[in-house]
Amino acid sequence: NGKGAPKIVLFTPIAHEDLGSPNLPDGKANNSRLALYAAATREVAEAKKAEFVDLFSSSAELFRASNVPLTINGIHLNPEGNRRMAEVIARSLLEREIPASPSLEKVRKVVLDKNWHWHNRYRATDGNDVWGGRSGLKFVDGQSNKDVLWHELSMIDVMVANRDMAVWAAVGNHKHKIDDSNVPAPIGVKSNVGGKSRSSNAGKEGNLKGYNSGKEGLAKLTVPEGMEVKLFADEKMFPELVNPVQMAVDTRGRLWAAAWPTYPKWEPLKKMDDRLLILPDENRDGVADKCITFARVHNPTGFEFWNGGVLVASQPDVLFLKDTDGDDVADVRIRLLQGIGSADTHHAANAFAMGADGAFYWQS
């Protein structure tokens, strides 16, 4: 508070929740180890006269009493688990009940926005171009990946600071509009298309103005007798359908596509417009009737239908998305796996497939 020394609070780790899954440990062995850490943390707190919060015992009680899972995998809390743990922490520190307030949802919304931007700063996807072996590659006029992408990191720093102000305003229930006008402009990148650098080949790339549209491409196909080819969908019909990277047909006969317009990753100050799309052909004329955005997902390199929903890559995570109210828009979003490779986004988890053995496969 600016008047005294900061107060130190020591928290134990949470317990390991038994989710009853054959694919996950039940947590008994882990809880024996975690209990030792909890006891050691208590001893240090008592010796140093520091505040102490026993999340290990509290979470174990919550897990036993809850009729819904509070973690995604036994050790990482889901949104409901985070909410209940927050109540435990507040009660322990303030020594009174702190009921969840509707205003907290507004705070949570801006915190998640800040977190998303910060996550793309410290865990930037396509990191090989940012920090790795390709960061020093130079293109037109000696401009390198590092020159451009490190500047983008500094842009995100400012955007995160702007959202931090929004968090504090929301906590105080003050009106606040995020203003990113103070964010440095991006560095202009000169195209190397047409042989303007060693990584470009004019012979292979040709003339950008000469690329065929979907309809123009049909006229150049050789079709066997008795067969017909139609243009089902393209980005002229549906602007959302840019850079489709995987397609699949659901049990209702609808085509789904993962579209990746931000390839190779989101650029600061631009809209994150990657999507998982549904393209139904309701009158069965061989042409998509509309384009539905099921979910916005950054770097959607692969997906597969599962458990009434969809597993989809969103580097560095694999998400489970599900529509529970029938409007074809995902209202459930669960992070199932974390830490998949994202250093080179177009080589990351893709070609999702559920095997006949019940196992989930992908290539990287």
Question: Which sequence ranges carry the predicted segments?
Answer:
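A structural signal for well-ordered alpha-helical segments within the folded catalytic domains
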Residues: 35, 39, 79-87, 242, ...
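The feature captures the short pre-catalytic strand/loop hairpin that immediately precedes
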Residues: 61-72, 363
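Extracytoplasmic/periplasmic, Sec-exported soluble proteins
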Residues: 29-36, 73-81, 239, 268, ...
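Conserved catalytic region of serine esterases and O-acyltransferases that act on ester linkages
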Residues: 47, 69-209
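Substrate-gating cap/lid alpha-helix
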Residues: 16-55
